[in-house]
């Protein structure tokens, strides 16, 4: 494994199967967050921001936006509304691009190649017009007719696409799991009301993705709900990703403000950015202009908690021995990790 692959992390899921029933699910997410933090601690805000693109492949723009918001807040500088709106647009454009690729490459959304290329090109073109806003303490951009025209073209191209409902194109893939009844309910969705509790944990050097010891879900994984069968669960996850893509395109016309984080101490900053998988959070403390503390929580940290949806929904589930690995892979893909994963089936 290369150094960059090690920094990306990896997901390991082990299932113990006995007499055709899943008895245990061990979800281990290896995320080298302490190593990433050490690469940023001691850096100035500007130097840390220059390092970030080298550390993250997926959700790179969202990582940049969340970090900018945290660093600027820690430095006591508030970006004006126009800058924040532009940064939100930048994150949403990345979310749209990554979601489209996921829908086509993983879930085989029937989109003509030329239309997909056109949508991705519009996302890239619009993002390039906003790139200047990734500077620390960025100034607002002048009125940009080309940007607005590109965003309008993106919305029109999406409307013209009229993607079908997941059940319409996934049916052969879903039919395989119609008889697999899932277990207990997944964790609750993480809400903005829980930010103060999460902040208290982070201040105590507890960066676990949970609230008061309980896991949470974020992004499309949270909105998919608890479905009775594996077939319906996968269908709802793909549908949630499709709806999130449409929502992101709609939001480009009037970008929402990120959730407010109250009660921050001097030199402390928290930044949030929405990704295709849910909210990304960075917490930074500056000491004499240099980074003293850097913490981050990504959607994958929440959605692949050891006591998260895989364990809660799969324990006690009856499935044929020859089908369990394929089922596990489909459910992992539905939860959409931002890291590579591997699965292991132990026959007890």
UniProtKB/Swiss-Prot annotation:
One Pfam family this sequence matches: NiFeSe_Hases
Coiled-coil ranges from the UniProt annotation: none
Highest rank taxon of the organism: Bacteria
Gene3D superfamilies attached to this UniProt entry: Cytochrome-c3 Hydrogenase, chain B
InterPro entries, per database record: Ni-dep_hyd_lsu, NiFe-Hase_large, NiFe/NiFeSe_hydrgnase_LSU
Molecular function in Gene Ontology: nickel cation binding
Alphabetized PANTHER family for the sequence: HYDROGENASE EXPRESSION_FORMATION PROTEIN HUPK, HYDROGENASE-2 LARGE CHAIN
Full protein name: Hydrogenase expression/formation protein HoxV
